[in-house]
Amino acid sequence: MKRSMYAGRVREEHIGTTITLKGWVSRRRDLGGLIFIDLRDREGVMQLVINPEEVSSDVMATAERLRSEYVIEVEGFVEARQQANDKLATGMVELKVSALTILNTAKTTPFEIKDDVEVSDDTRLRYRYLDLRRPEMLENFKLRAKVTHSIRNYLDDLEFIDVETPMLTKSTPEGARDYLVPSRVSQGHFYALPQSPQITKQLLMNAGFDRYYQIVKCFRDEDLRGDRQPEFTQVDLETSFLSEQEIQDIVEGMIAKVMKETKEIDVTLPFPRMSYDVAMNSYGSDKPDTRFEMLLQDLTVTVKGIDFKVFSEAPAVKAIVVKGNADRYSRKDIDKLTEFAKQFGAKGLAWVKVTDGQLAGPVAKFLTAIETELSSQLKLAENDLVLFVADTLEVANNTLGALRNRIARDLDMIDQSQFNFLWVVDWPMFEWSEEEGRYMSAHHPFTLPTPESAHELEGDLAKVRAIAYDIVLNGYELGGGSLRINQKEMQERMFKALGFTADEANDQFGFLLEAMDYGFPPHGGLAIGLDRFVMLLAEEDNIREVIAFPKNNKASDPMTQAPSLVSENQLEELSLQIESHD
């Protein structure tokens, strides 16, 4: 029989019609001789009623065999329910079954197919095809499909060209670890799976495509966390002849369209802009969450003359004020915050509370001489808690930024209904890597430096600024972009600043440098993490919830057991040997 419609879409207007439905048995109940079945498909659940007085003995016998997750086909008459169920979209109607066929049986599932099921993440991933049957998971992927549909329509309307770039590319430095693919034909050589289509999309601009986009898989072999996976999807854009502002306008329009069509939210345009320095100094993060206050306060000058060397001799002293919540934090609670602070390089955490109009706490006695000035600067009031970090500016910012976010979550200070977008601009071109002992690209080595700072490529690299911009949503980096280098001489200077010899630069990027000899236009672009964007729109805490078949925290798949061993024959074809490092 041909299915008439989805079970979850049957409504009162269908009363009096005969329809055919197909789906899974979500629940079976026997009551007063009647059998009630909740039939589930991707659109929802509908109640079926099987009355032994109105169906054949064969239908009744089949109904009595039904168990959870059996796949069935039913035909019946749509009726109004005697008692409506306002928890279901189909709660005003039910189907009086006249015909029933079991299409497939099912074993008892390892967990119940319902929302808010309590089961380990690895069990969910081991049986991902069952986990994806849960209504909230289905809704996440419907949302994801709507987002990608909206993005494609928007970019198509703006005459962007959708172009597929290679999955087998060249391994290049200056990024995360590559996933490598050995070549059978060129033995001893390897492809890399792309961390992004960065260079190829720039070459498309040199080819005259003018506006490119792609919703593309990318791969990075890095440590995992809640908003990272080894393979991920990004919305990749590149344009020719547009300014930084023009590119941002296009992206803002795209996001506004997605928010309207998927969440029915009108976002205010243009998005706020914040410099990198303001973000770090006021929020302690290059991806600030602006849904709440608790800004970092610089007290370095204020405490300079006090008789407390931890403060007076520190390169930087900064603080955050937890307004009106000092009584929520015991000494034990603050000790936990101190241990948390040490994870970010801080040596400790100093604190005072405002109690009966005065400062109280371990360091209060050292602040007596500046108490009035301090109270005024921090706008202190009764029951405030002040947390101080005295260290380098970088450690103070990073530590207090992390504390700010943790405390806001702990105290439920964040309005979860808000979607606060902003641009972080005016980035440094380089960042110092303690591990590498050198400066590395803050974004990538193809970013265009500002005209005012480009001369420092041969001087103080810390002073070079980039024409780069990150888009941030609620404390998450949604994506980043920049104007790109299109002049060969500038690109060679950039490689040299990063420590490449001329031969090394030519070996790694010679094809790009050669392309710059052939009229490379000014260009720029951006990439947005689609998984992360959908995660935030779905109000989930982990991108695994919006990726159909993700990896676990060990970058493995409990369902397929990937990664797996391969045969000796396969290794021999690739001229590879596995060495043990026990």
From Swiss-Prot:
Binding site for L-aspartate: E174, R220, H443, R484
UniProt KW keywords: Aminoacyl-tRNA synthetase, ATP-binding, Cytoplasm, Ligase, Nucleotide-binding, Protein biosynthesis
Keyword Repressor recorded: no
One example GO MF annotation: nucleic acid binding
Gene3D superfamilies found in the cross-reference section: Bira Bifunctional Protein, Domain 2 (3.30.930.10), GAD-like domain (3.30.1360.30), Nucleic acid-binding proteins (2.40.50.140)
Gene Ontology process terms (BP): aspartyl-tRNA aminoacylation
Top-rank taxon: Bacteria
CDD domains assigned to the protein according to its UniProt record, in alphabetical order: AspRS_core, EcAspRS_like_N
Catalytic activity: tRNA(Asp) + L-aspartate + ATP = L-aspartyl-tRNA(Asp) + AMP + diphosphate
Quaternary structure annotation from Swiss-Prot or TrEMBL: Homodimer.
Family indicated by similarity: Belongs to the class-II aminoacyl-tRNA synthetase family. Type 1 subfamily.
Its job: Catalyzes the attachment of L-aspartate to tRNA(Asp) in a two-step reaction: L-aspartate is first activated by ATP to form Asp-AMP and then transferred to the acceptor end of tRNA(Asp).
Name the UniProt record assigns to this protein: Aspartate--tRNA ligase
Organism: Streptococcus pyogenes serotype M6 (strain ATCC BAA-946 / MGAS10394)
